[in-house]
Amino acid sequence: MLNQQPRLRRIAWMGSSFDDLRQFPEDVRRDAGFQLYRLQSGLEAADWKAMPQLGRGVEEIRLRHFSGAYRVIYLARFAEAIYVLHCFNKKTRRTAEHEKQIVRSRLRVIQQEHRSQK
């Protein structure tokens, strides 16, 4: 039997999310990349949480580091891609309203694109 690689879903980086991720410490970036690879392969991230208050299908990958908590917010409900909506360093127990607004505005762009394709 041939050992086949899984077909990976495309990652679509919204806004500045890729540049924001690149600002994370190296080991956090590496862990985020591995967790995104798991999503691309059809698996769940190791530590994730649904974020229904931000939109249907929005989820976050939770990354911990001695320098703080980091988040990768994504949408994986569409077959063509995993949309990375936002990446940020979480500084308080609750997600800041500013971070939520960024996610909502980028999610609206995706929703409008999907409506126009129907």
Q: What residue ranges belong to the model's regions?
A:
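Portal/gating segments that form or line small-molecule/metal binding sites
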Residues: 72
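Catalytic DNA-binding helix-loop module of base-excision-repair DNA glycosylases/AP lyases
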Residues: 75
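Conserved catalytic cores of phosphodiester-cleaving nucleases, focusing on short active-site segments
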Residues: 85
